Amino acid sequence: MTATIEETQETGSAGVGRIARVIGPVVDVEFPVDSMPEIYNKLECELTLEGEAKILSLEVAQHIGDGMVRAISLQPTDGLVRGAQVTDTGGPITVPVGDATLGKVFNTLGEVLNLEEGETFEVKERWGIHRKAPAFDQLESKTQMFETGIKVIDLLTPYVQGGKIGLFGGAGVGKTVLIQEMIARVAKDHGGVSVFAGVGERTREGNDLIVEMEEAGVIGQTALVFGQMDEPPGTRLRVALSALTMAEYFRDVQGQDVLLFIDNIFRFTQAGSEVSTLLGRMPSAVGYQPNLADEMGTLQERITSTRGHSITSMQAIYVPADDYTDPAPATTFAHLDATTELSREIASLGIYPAVDPLTSTSRILDPQYIGQAHYDCAIRIKQILQRNKELQDIIAILGVDELSEEDKIIVSRARRIQRFLSQNTYVAKQFTGIEGSTVPVSETIEGFNKIADGEYDHVAEQAFFMCGGLDDVEQKWAEIQKSL
């Protein structure tokens, strides 16, 4: 059974039930037949654990019949007993919205996690996390490029203002670093409000992100919502909706362009799979939940642009065992406007961001959106890199000397292009000691055209590595020549 809750819900008449069964995070609760809570309603149960009283929150997932509902706990169920009293709040989980959320760290239930001692948090309005996607006639039809200042992204996989962007990659190839870099760049170059959803985030990563944002002075324009890796699956499944609800308020009520960062969509799918198994549903392909496409669509369809206002979403997506045919990443592909695939092979060369220029895609890599000059340059660079890839087998067997003169030139320029696609990032400065760089799109196009034309054939390959524009390359080349 499903139900959709619209707009801000008022608490209805509260029903009271009793716990009938507890199996891990799954709790069966018996209510009077005439006051059963609706699907997605939040239930509360008071319990005492080690002498400390606390309120446990649950969300109704199924109606079993005869007044019995099955709920998923959003907190550990230690200390929960049969017969304990449960109260129906009359509405879904709600989270605080508005300017008061900026600079704060929340959990899935909208509770603040970073209050100083003696500090209080008051908010005028709370919204339910289950909401309808905007109607078709409210959507924005205009398409505009979102400039990041990162060469490989702006040139070959341009992002869409108000679009959905996926950062795909296996473990350890730089998804979270790229997400953190985009947060830093948005705050530095674009201003505006950001919302970050840590779905199944490692505690260390979350802490690093908060510290970096505080040091950069950008946390005051960001709301952060975490459902950490060690929390029950119900929490991890709903944390993205909590963050999205906060972002929707900034878009719909305040009329702002919002950036929504989600790390990691795979763990959203994984949490849904755990909940589905706990509820006894028959698993689908590779053990995933049978309603995977529906669950993903419910989240993704709400991330969109309405007339004049947008939510631009950047989503890190873990690819299990680097297998892109796995149902979790494959289901996400259909919803995205741009895909940035991070390659372990490119990362092993020390080229960062480790974006694969040949497999990454964008809906707006088209002359009508980005202009003919940008499109021609991108296609030209892709052709050179593709030809270089085709020649690698010949080089591995026979060596470079066996290539034709034309192919030797292509390989030489492709190697320079590969290295010029690397770039220092602001968030990696603490490791490298080198300041990040932002390169305008016009400068990026000019630089790659000059390399493809052969104007920099005389410059050593290492001079192109981790540079911003061609000025940096020339400066580095001059330093290399001095040291020879």
Swiss-Prot record:
GO cellular component: plasma membrane; proton-transporting ATP synthase complex
Membrane protein topology class: Peripheral membrane protein
Uppermost EC category: translocase
Reactions the enzyme catalyzes: ATP + H2O + 4 H(+)(in) = ADP + phosphate + 5 H(+)(out)
EC number(s) given by UniProt: 7.1.2.2
Principal place of residence: membrane
Keyword Nucleotide-binding part of the UniProt annotation: yes
Xref: Pfam families: ATP-synt_ab (PF00006), ATP-synt_ab_N (PF02874), ATP-synt_VA_C (PF22919)
Compartments (UniProt record): Cell membrane
InterPro entries in the cross-refs: AAA+_ATPase, ATP-synt_VA_C, ATP_synth_F1_bsu, ATPase_a/bsu_AS, ATPase_alpha/beta_chains, ATPase_F1/V1/A1_a/bsu_N, ATPase_F1/V1/A1_a/bsu_N_sf, ATPase_F1/V1/A1_a/bsu_nucl-bd
Keywords recorded for this protein, A-Z: ATP synthesis, ATP-binding, Cell membrane, CF(1), Hydrogen ion transport, Ion transport, Membrane, Nucleotide-binding, Translocase, Transport
UniProt GO MF annotations: ATP binding; ATP hydrolysis activity; proton-transporting ATP synthase activity, rotational mechanism
Binding site for ATP: G169, G170, A171, G172, V173, G174, K175, T176
CDD domains tied to this protein: ATP-synt_F1_beta_C, ATP-synt_F1_beta_N, F1-ATPase_beta_CD
Subunit structure comment from the entry: F-type ATPases have 2 components, CF(1) - the catalytic core - and CF(0) - the membrane proton channel. CF(1) has five subunits: alpha(3), beta(3), gamma(1), delta(1), epsilon(1). CF(0) has three main subunits: a(1), b(2) and c(9-12). The alpha and beta chains form an alternating ring which encloses part of the gamma chain. CF(1) is attached to CF(0) by a central stalk formed by the gamma and epsilon chains, while a peripheral stalk is formed by the delta and b chains.
Stored NCBIfam families: atpD
Function (record text): Produces ATP from ADP in the presence of a proton gradient across the membrane. The catalytic sites are hosted primarily by the beta subunits.
Family to which this protein belongs: Belongs to the ATPase alpha/beta chains family.
The protein, known as: ATP synthase subunit beta
Originating species: Nocardioides sp. (strain ATCC BAA-499 / JS614)
Gene behind the chain: atpD
